[in-house]
Amino acid sequence: ASDVYKRQVKNAEGYVAYVKEASASDDAYEKLDDTLIRQYADYWRADALGLKEGSYVMKVTAVLKDGKTVSESTSSLEVEKYDRSGFAFSENSKFQTGSGAYNDDGTLKKDAQVIYVTPETAKTCTAVVNGKEVTGFQSILDAKQSAGTKDTSPLDFRIVGCVTADDVDHFSSSAEGIQLKGKSAYTEMNITIEGVGEDAAVQGFGFLVRNSGNVEFRNFAVMAFMDDGISLDTKNCNIWVHNMDIFYGSTGGDSDQAKGDGSVDIKGASTNVTVSYVHFWDSGKCSLCGMSDSAEFLVTYHHNWFDHSDSRHPRIRVASVHIYNNYFDGNAKYGVGTTKGSSAFVEANYYRNCKNPMMSSMQGTDALGQGTFSGENGGMIKAYNNITVGASSLIYALSLIHI
């Protein structure tokens, strides 16, 4: 396909792209939506979404100025499945999945509506909710809230390009920006918000999620958000945040909010959450896991890159949390912190120049009196098979040695 671009782009008025399973006949080609084909400075790009794991072939047709067409097919392309693991996919959870508008094999659910959100269409995109056509990114989500369980049909919002605060029809959360809210606790939403390609982003706002079940965020960046990047605030379940780039937010009013508040915060009886394959860029307070919660809730963090973020990786109250295969890289304050009877299983992580890799309030490292953490009652950390390089302090129970 790249040869077609190089030879024909000067004479082409546009491109059409198709995809099929590699073993299928040519009449099985399915046309990609036009929005999935984009022109860049010196190349065109087409993305095929909603494919299950397997081998595929794409065909690109150039439409020339004289009306003729030239087509070329790719060699076999391998599609890998996402890593659907962690508490969002627990068999004991309410919905047993966090795949949103998708099936767990990576294909769109049968009755899913696809809504393309671009800088040009964020105010004008449409979807049918509870039998009525609704216009605008936030307005569609507001209608979904009003419908409650009357309309649980899946919605797949696909972000193309960089959508800024000025592009959006309105915000239902003055603190965060876009609000995704169910009508009552743990409402089945079946919503995916995903980016297309390598440059999808939102800038100047974040997301507030409340009363929602089965919601997925994936494959886009969140930049210069208002307060929190993604706030899972009240009575959510089966939420999956993955393959994201989260930068820091706007400066807040408190002394510890120079980089905004939380990047991904989880609180208010939100449970069965997985945060995975996320690149946290220089965050100040990365992930709060519990605020005024009094009952146990379940969260998994795996395969994340905490890239020179300062603290809260995560900062845990009450919850039971599995933290594995993460890269803690140059963290100025601390890595995992537990308080208020929380339990963390910290497994197979790599700590590089993380000042205090693991802390339980008023115990061990925190008891040294540096004032780096919390005065709340402590929690429990079980650490296994971690690698630690360049830490200032790491104290294990029943050990006379600390680093």
Locations of regions flagged by a protein language model:
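Short, small-residue-biased leader/transition segments that mark boundaries at the very start
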Residues: A1-Y5, I403
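Beta-strand-rich modules
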Residues: A48-G67
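Extracellular fibronectin type III
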Residues: K65-R84
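Long, ordered, amphipathic alpha-helical scaffolds
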Residues: S85-T97, Q113-I115, E120, V128-E133, ...
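Acidic Gly/Asp/Thr-rich repetitive segments characteristic of extracellular carbohydrate-active
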Residues: E91-D156
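Extracellular beta-strand-rich solenoid/capping regions of secreted or surface-exposed proteins
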Residues: K132-T152, V168-T192, A201-R218, M223-C237, ...
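Extracellular beta-strand/beta-solenoid scaffold signature
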Residues: S172-K181, Q203-F207, A224-D233, G253-K267, ...
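Right-handed parallel beta-helix
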Residues: M189-D199, G213-A224, N236-G252, G262-S263, ...
